[in-house]
Amino acid sequence: SVGFKAGVKEYKLTYYTPEYETKDTDILAAFRVTAQPGVPPEEAGAAVAAESSTGTWTAVWTDGLTSLDRYKGRCYHIEPVVGEEEQFIAYVAYPLDLFEEGSVTNMFTSIVGNVFGFKALRALRLEDLRIPTAYVKTFQGPPHGIQVERDKLNKYGRPLLGCTIKPKLGLSAKNYGRAVYECLRGGLDFTKDDENVNSQPFMRWRDRFCFCAEALYKAQAETGEIKGHYLNATAGTCEEMIKRAVFARELGVPIVMHDYLTGGFTANTTLAHYCRDNGLLLHIHRAMHAVIDRQKNHGMHFRVLAKALRMSGGDHVHAGTVVGKLEGERDITLGFVDLLRDDYIEKDRSRGVYFTQDWVSLPGVIPVASGGIHVWHMPALTEIFGDDAVLQFGGGTLGHPWGNPPGAVANRVALEACVKARNEGRDLATEGNEIIREACKWSPELAAACEVWKEIRFNFAAVDTLDPTA
């Protein structure tokens, strides 16, 4: 009979629709689902679709006041995971009308909201999202993008070099500025505030900004190269964050920085809009990402966080090193590096890319390799990341036995040697160590660095790995 019928009914009756053909305007999601014992995959997949869109636990009278068929999420495909009895991939399509234009915050509140605490699921992980071009076009995206950044900096044909100032906490503003000057003077393109440097009692933000700007201008005058220091504008409120960005602009520096996950997507998008309007580049640090993305069965993969960042806005984002001290498997890392840089990325499950993604005209983001890397890694980094990357050596610069400027010189010489060798057709993967040794003959600074770090390795297996193929 027609009319309202109270009670609880199975999700799959409404939300599991294997016959559904996805639309170009749908947001598509791939979830790794671990259901509770006894919950069939169709019901679990439908529950994910329901709880992340229009559904609730019981039939409600007000369902009759809207068109559920128009607004509901749909689980349209379920795929087993090879070697995992209890896991499967559920594909869900969401109609575009469910999401506010230009708001990553709203998109995530639905797709990775309450559903992650749902009792019928033991664990849930969002592996990938397909953002339709209609939704992409509602975002500004990165303030400037890769080409505009190169033009602003007048640096072409090689990766950029950076250094995080250490110790990350405890230096006075003047000593901090001195380290910035020494690194930039030695040949680096950028230095960086650590992500946890905001405005603490030992160094207030305004003092740091002033001394870093002085260091930057002095290094520029002496080297004839454009230099940058990522001034961290992250703050406790959006108003304070913008105040710091305004002061950075008044100092005339080229780039500011934000911690986009701890700061939040609303704050990040606000800052990205300010940066485009005022000609500032925006460096993004991903502090807190491993809380969300490191476990293979629960949370959200970093490729989703990377896509969200490209939509929200940032010119650089940390993306792992493959070879350093932090988590990151090569194929997976290259998968999301492409998602950050390229306009069009084909589906490629061998690199963890579940959907073809078309970014239309959204600018690209430069991936930043940072964390436990040093001069011996330079050939591998140049080969893995190519030219459009920032290679950041914190301890690998400041840990040089002769001090900061020689540490910077060693990194710049190693990079120039690798780029030259690559351009001459040499294979960096097989000849890397030899290329670095040859360069040592012309650079005592590089030779000293090579001696210090010749035995350093971080050999641990990655936690987050690709699924085996059948």
Curated annotation (Swiss-Prot):
List of residues that carry N6,N6,N6-trimethyllysine: 5
Compartmental location: Plastid, Chloroplast
GO BP annotations listed: photorespiration; reductive pentose-phosphate cycle
EC numbers: 4.1.1.39
Domain of life: Eukaryota
Cofactor: binding comment: Binds 1 Mg(2+) ion per subunit.
A cellular component term, taken from the record's GO annotations: chloroplast
Active site per UniProt: 166 (proton acceptor), 285 (proton acceptor)
EC class (word): lyase
InterPro entries attached to this UniProt entry: RuBisCO, RuBisCo_large_chain_AS, RuBisCO_lsu_C, RuBisCO_lsu_C_sf, RuBisCO_lsu_fd_N, RuBisCO_lsu_N_sf, RuBisCO_lsuI
Binding annotation for substrate: 114, 164, 168, 286, 318, 370
Keywords: Calvin cycle, Carbon dioxide fixation, Chloroplast, Disulfide bond, Lyase, Magnesium, Metal-binding, Methylation, Monooxygenase, Oxidoreductase, Photorespiration, Photosynthesis, Plastid
UniProt xrefs under Pfam families: RuBisCO_large, RuBisCO_large_N
Residues the UniProt record annotates as site (Transition state stabilizer): 325
Residue positions binding Mg(2+): 192, 194-195
GO molecular function: magnesium ion binding; monooxygenase activity; ribulose-bisphosphate carboxylase activity
PANTHER family listed in its UniProt record: RIBULOSE BISPHOSPHATE CARBOXYLASE, RIBULOSE BISPHOSPHATE CARBOXYLASE LARGE CHAIN
Biological function: RuBisCO catalyzes two reactions: the carboxylation of D-ribulose 1,5-bisphosphate, the primary event in carbon dioxide fixation, as well as the oxidative fragmentation of the pentose substrate in the photorespiration process. Both reactions occur simultaneously and in competition at the same active site.
Miscellaneous information on this protein: The basic functional RuBisCO is composed of a large chain homodimer in a 'head-to-tail' conformation. In form I RuBisCO this homodimer is arranged in a barrel-like tetramer with the small subunits forming a tetrameric 'cap' on each end of the 'barrel'.
Family (UniProt): Belongs to the RuBisCO large chain family. Type I subfamily.
Name this polypeptide is given: Ribulose bisphosphate carboxylase large chain
Gene that encodes it: rbcL
